[in-house]
Amino acid sequence: MAAKDVQFGNEVRQKMVNGVNILANAVRVTLGPKGRNVVVDRAFGGPHITKDGVTVAKEIELKDKFENMGAQMVKEVASKTNDVAGDGTTTATVLAQSIVAEGMKYVTAGMNPTDLKRGIDKAVAALVEELKNIAKPCDTSKEIAQVGSISANSDEQVGAIIAEAMEKVGKEGVITVEDGKSLENELDVVEGMQFDRGYLSPYFINDAEKQIAALDNPFVLLFDKKISNIRDLLPVLEQVAKASRPLLIIAEDVEGEALATLVVNNIRGILKTVAVKAPGFGDRRKAMLQDIAILTGGVVISEEVGLSLEKATLDDLGQAKRIEIGKENTTIIDGFGDAAQIEARVAEIRQQIETATSDYDKEKLQERVAKLAGGVAVIKVGAATEVEMKEKKDRVEDALHATRAAVEEGVVAGGGVALLRARAALENLHTGNADQDAGVQIVLRAVESPLRQIVANAGGEPSVVVNKVLEGKGNYGYNAGSGEYGDMIEMGVLDPAKVTRSALQHAASIAGLMLTTDCMIAEIPEDKPAVPDMGGMGGMGGMM
C-alpha cells in the first residue's frame, strides 16, 4: 500500500480553498447574458468552446492533490445541480465559492465550524421556503420561450423552438436534441407512438420514394413469442384477407417459412402485411407490447394469459388509422384504443416513475408516457462548423432542462434577483447562538454573489448595481443583457424556481462539508525510476 500524506488544520484548508477558487474562477466567467466563452483542449479533434458551467467543471483536474480535492468537491456541486435541475451549474458554483470564502474567515477567526454549518443550513431552509412562496406558475408558451432563451444565453430562437416543441408534444412529451444538417435549427415532430424497430424484410416496402412501408387503416397483431410456422398464422391471415385490410405483425421475431410466406403474399398483392420485431427486451418488451395493445385497442396474444395464435380472431387485433414502418422505426398514428384505458395506463406508468430508483428506469418510463400521451419532438441543431454545433447543442440541452424545471416548480425573477428578494426571510431568523448567527450572515452575503458575477461579466460595477436592486422591491432588477433596470418578469428574464433552489441547496451542502473539514489525506506519488535506454542489438551495427 502506498504511503499517504496526512495534513491538518488551516494550512490544508487553505489548499482546499485554492482548488475551489481555481475551478470556480474558470466556471464563473460563463454566467449571465454577457458570459464569456471557455475554450477546452481535446485530445482528438478541435478545441471545444462552451458557456456551460458543468462542461467546464468536468474538464478540471489539478496537479496538487489537496487543491484537487477542493476542486472535485465543487465539481460535485455543479454535477449534482445539473442532474437534478439540468441547469444552474454556474450559479451553484458561484454560491459555493462565496459560502466557502466567507465561512473560512470565521473558521480562521476561531468560530465553531459545526455551528457555522448549522446556521448555514437553517438560512438555506428559510430561503428555499421563501423561493417557493415567490415562485409563480409557468404555463404559457411565451413564458416557456423566455425561460429557454435565458438559459441558452439569451438566444431567443432556442427559446421559441423549445416552446413550440412543448406545445406540440405536451409538457410530458419526449424532446430530444440531435445534430442538424443545415445552418438553422429545425423542429421535427413525430405524432403518435414511435418505437425503434423497422421492417424485417425490405420486400415489405410499398413507398419507394420514402423507403417505407405505409399501411392505411391496418389491423395490428401483437404476439410475445417467435413466429416461424405459417400454419399458426393462417387463421388470422384468412380473416384479415376477408376484411380486405392490411396487417402489421409485431412479435419477438418472425422467421423462416412464416416470413417467406408473408413476403410472397405481399409481392403478389394477395395480402398486404408487414412484420416487425417487438421493441425492448425482457420485462420492458412485455410492458411496451401492452402499451401498443392499449393504444390500438387490441390484446397481446400470449400463452401466459391463455391465448394462442391459431385461435386469435379479429377482435383480438388492434387497429390504427395509419402506420409507417421504416428501416429502423415504426410509427403508429391515431390508434383506435379507448381514451379512458390509455389515461389509466399513463397514470399507472407515472406511479412507477415515482417509485423508480434508477435514472435510466425513470427515463425509459418517461418515454413510455410520452409515446402514449403525446408524441416525440426532435430539435435538430444547425450550425456552420462542428465546434459551433457542439457549443450550441450544449446550450439547447441546458435550455430544455430549464424549461422542464420551470413547468415543474414555477418561475422566479431571473438575473440573481430572486435570491436577493428571498433574503427577507433571513431578517428575523435568530438562532440564539452567536456562531450559528454568523452562519446565517454568511448565506446573507453569499446570495448577492450570482448578481455580482453577472454584472462583472457584463462589464458593470457590481456594488452599485446590487445596492440599486436592493432599493427596489418585488421583481425589480438589472437586465445585464440590455443594461436596463426594471421588472425582470416583464422583461422576460426568468429563472426556474427549481434551478435556483437546487443551486442554493447543493452549494450550501458541499460548502458546509468543507468548513467542517480538519484533515485531508492524499497518496504520496511514487518516484518511479526512468526506463533505461535500449542497448544496441547485435548484428545491427550498420543501422546505428
Swiss-Prot record:
Keywords: ATP-binding, Chaperone, Cytoplasm, Isomerase, Nucleotide-binding. PROSITE patterns: CHAPERONINS_CPN60 (PS00296). It is found in: Cytoplasm. Its EC number is 5.6.1.7. ATP binds at T30, L31, G32, P33, K51, D87, G88, T89, T90, T91, G415, D495. CDD domains: GroEL. It catalyses: ATP + H2O + a folded polypeptide = ADP + phosphate + an unfolded polypeptide. One of its GO terms (molecular function) is isomerase activity. Its main location: cytoplasm. InterPro entries: Chaperonin_Cpn60_CS (IPR018370), Cpn60/GroEL (IPR001844), Cpn60/GroEL/TCP-1 (IPR002423), GroEL-like_apical_dom_sf (IPR027409), GROEL-like_equatorial_sf (IPR027413), TCP-1-like_intermed_sf (IPR027410). Signal peptide: none annotated. It comes from the Bacteria. One of its GO terms (biological process) is protein refolding. Belongs to the chaperonin (HSP60) family. Forms a cylinder of 14 subunits composed of two heptameric rings stacked back-to-back. Interacts with the co-chaperonin GroES. Together with its co-chaperonin GroES, plays an essential role in assisting protein folding. The GroEL-GroES system forms a nano-cage that allows encapsulation of the non-native substrate proteins and provides a physical environment optimized to promote and accelerate protein folding. This is Chaperonin GroEL. The lineage of its organism: Bacteria, Pseudomonadati, Pseudomonadota, Betaproteobacteria, Neisseriales. The gene is groEL.
